[in-house]
Design a protein with these regions (language model features):
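Beta-loop-alpha module in the N-terminal Rossmann-like domain of NAD(P)-dependent dehydrogenases
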Residues: 18, 50-92
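N-terminal Rossmann-like dinucleotide-binding module
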Residues: 1-48
Length: 92
């Protein structure tokens, strides 16, 4: 089985939990992290050896990403979901 490569959108409480779980799973890799709070996103990216995305679209559209974890505020979910669907990514 190949490694599942993730983009993580949002590094609040639940985003941090998912970042850690992705990191601890040997069959997954955290490739990109994005959050409107750049400093918080940078901390998580550095902690888990991921790249910091400047925009959600940058993370979602990268060809190295297989799936997108949407951990942002609920009102933003639909926009990110549509971006990920358009990019043909698995969505969590």
């Amino acid at each position: 089985m190949k490694t599942l490569r993730f983009a993580l959108l949002g590094v609040g409480r639940i985003g941090k939990v998912h970042a850690k779980n992705i990191f601890l799973n040997p069959k997954s890799s955290l490739c990109f992290v994005y959050d409107i709070n750049t400093k918080a996103a940078e901390e998580i990216a550095n902690k888990y050896n991921a790249k910091l995305a400047n925009t959600a679209l940058e993370a979602i559209s990268n060809p190295d990403v297989d799936a997108v974890f949407i951990c942002t505020a609920t009102p933003t979910h639909i926009d990110y979901l549509l971006m990920a669907a358009k990019a043909n990514k698995s969505i969590l």
